Amino acid sequence: MLMIITGKSASGKDTIKKELVKKDYEPVLSLTTRQPREGEKYGLDYIYTVNEYFESLLEQDKLYESRKAGNIYYGTLKSDLDIIKHNPEKNYIMIKDLEGAEDIIDYVGQKNVFVAYIDVSDDIRKKRASIRNDFSEEKW
């Protein structure tokens, strides 16, 4: 079973994911070209890479889904989704936007996926984003 956590920025997705990983959920990491935030680690939160490498994965058709937000790429490796597809008895967890979640459901199969949308007030999200130095009025 794959649990996909989705929600707006600073809604608490990473906190929930980290707690479930402690309870034997296997994390499925997205690739991203953004810089790590304070406290984030390669291989624990994301697979951090550069645009050139990400674009080469796209050209080689190794990514199942990808998004670009500004100059930052996010994506999921087909090989990771194949592992989930062939091991439905294991518990996996990942964070995606709604569009990415829909793409992954199409690939893995709806019966193998549970999507949880985390809804938090904008005031709380702004406070959290300010704490992690990731708040600007333009983004909100």
Predicted segments, located by residue:
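The feature captures the helix immediately C-terminal to the Walker
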Residues: 17-18
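Conserved phosphate-donor/acceptor-positioning beta-strand/loop module used by diverse small-molecule
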Residues: 91-97, 109-130
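P-loop (Walker A) phosphate-binding loop of NTP-binding proteins
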Residues: 8
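ATP-dependent small-molecule kinase phosphotransfer cores
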Residues: 33-92, 98-99
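Post-Walker A helix-loop "phosphate-sensing" segment adjacent to the P-loop in P-loop NTPases
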Residues: 22-30
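Hydrophobic anchor at the beta1->P-loop junction of P-loop NTPases
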Residues: 5
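Small-molecule kinase domains that catalyze NTP-dependent phosphoryl transfer to phosphate-bearing small molecules
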Residues: 101, 131-140
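Walker A/P-loop
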Residues: 13-14
